[in-house]
Amino acid sequence: MKHYEVEILDAKTREKLCFLDKVEPQATIAEIKNLFTKTHPQWYPARQSLRLDPKGKSLKDEDVLQKLPVGTTATLYFRDLGAQISWVTVFLTEYAGPLFIYLLFYFRVPFIYGRKYDFTSSRHTVVHLACICHSFHYIKRLLETLFVHRFSHGTMPLRNIFKNCTYYWGFAAWMAYYINHPLYTPPTYGAQQVKLALAIFVICQLGNFSIHMALRDLRPAGSKTRKIPYPTRNPFTWLFLLVSCPNYTYEVGSWIGFAIMTQCLPVALFSLVGFTQMTIWAKGKHRSYLKEFRDYPPLRMPIIPFLL
């Protein structure tokens, strides 16, 4: 059997970092990363980006050496991705924060609203309902992270956790401060507005969960397989007929419902910022589907049926 020689160079300086002799032709990039780690333990596999060109795209872990456009002596270029952290850890951290931060304002712990309001309770029903909805949303997210989601990438850059937590925790504190404030004013149209908003919130939360379950069933555990998602017997998944990322559609709908329920400006701004970011993600996933699958349904839009 013909073996390969693999030299790994620094993508910036072109310095030779490692030379691997007698590498099996069937070796994957993941296996080469493991071999590289033996000579450079500080660069564990998740930190490594190996590519054929210094400015090219990173090779996938499942790429096989003999199927790459290289000779028997392959030259790969290395870039350090920096310290990594697991997606699960990031999600648990960024979702647990809003849950507990909101409750601090709801229970009016000392030093927030003034001594005479410490541990007092709001007289408005909508305030208590908002706390239930907000808590339910993030408890759902935490449970989905632990038991539902299957991640195609195991890690992300450590710096992202600070950015993500600033966003989620900051907005949670901002909206909680006003919703639970002793001078908070209930919605203009009273109980009718709250009931309508609650219905929107509940429907969208059920829809979001249904989509996450449908996406989970598409990918076997431990696999990176990608398939076209289609509607199932669950009516909430029928939105797949019109959009590529209905989980984002339902998520935005949930926050719109919460904004209507509380009639609170910070919630409306959080909904707008979230919609903007999710639209960017949805467009990216939509493009990936179109590029990967020739038979991808042409009627679908990224996030809003017929529009966007």
Swiss-Prot record:
Keywords (A to Z) from UniProt: Acetylation, Endoplasmic reticulum, Fatty acid biosynthesis, Fatty acid metabolism, Lipid biosynthesis, Lipid metabolism, Membrane, NADP, Oxidoreductase, Phosphoprotein, Sphingolipid metabolism, Steroid biosynthesis, Transmembrane, Transmembrane helix
GO MF annotation terms: oxidoreductase activity; very-long-chain enoyl-CoA reductase activity
E.C. code: 1.3.1.93
Pathway annotation from the record: Lipid metabolism; fatty acid biosynthesis; Lipid metabolism; sphingolipid metabolism
Residues with the N6-acetyllysine modification: K22, K60
Membrane topology value: Multi-pass membrane protein
UniProt keyword Ribonucleoprotein present: no
PTM note: Glycosylated.
Any one GO BP annotation for this protein: very long-chain fatty acid biosynthetic process
Modified sites of kind Phosphoserine: S58
Lipid metabolism listed as a keyword: yes
Catalytic activity annotation: a very-long-chain 2,3-saturated fatty acyl-CoA + NADP(+) = a very-long-chain (2E)-enoyl-CoA + NADPH + H(+); octadecanoyl-CoA + NADP(+) = (2E)-octadecenoyl-CoA + NADPH + H(+); (2E,7Z,10Z,13Z,16Z)-docosapentaenoyl-CoA + NADPH + H(+) = (7Z,10Z,13Z,16Z)-docosatetraenoyl-CoA + NADP(+); (2E,7Z,10Z,13Z,16Z,19Z)-docosahexaenoyl-CoA + NADPH + H(+) = (7Z,10Z,13Z,16Z,19Z)-docosapentaenoyl-CoA + NADP(+)
Localization annotation: Endoplasmic reticulum membrane
Lumenal side: 107-124, 181-189, 263-264
Segments traversing the membrane: 87-106, 125-147, 159-180, 190-216, 246-262, 265-292
Cytoplasmic side: 1-86, 148-158, 217-245, 293-308
UniProt GO cellular component terms: endoplasmic reticulum; endoplasmic reticulum membrane
Similarity comment: Belongs to the steroid 5-alpha reductase family.
Subunit structure: Interacts with ELOVL1 and LASS2.
Function field: Involved in both the production of very long-chain fatty acids for sphingolipid synthesis and the degradation of the sphingosine moiety in sphingolipids through the sphingosine 1-phosphate metabolic pathway. Catalyzes the last of the four reactions of the long-chain fatty acids elongation cycle. This endoplasmic reticulum-bound enzymatic process, allows the addition of 2 carbons to the chain of long- and very long-chain fatty acids/VLCFAs per cycle.
Protein name from the UniProt record: Very-long-chain enoyl-CoA reductase
Natural source organism: Bos taurus
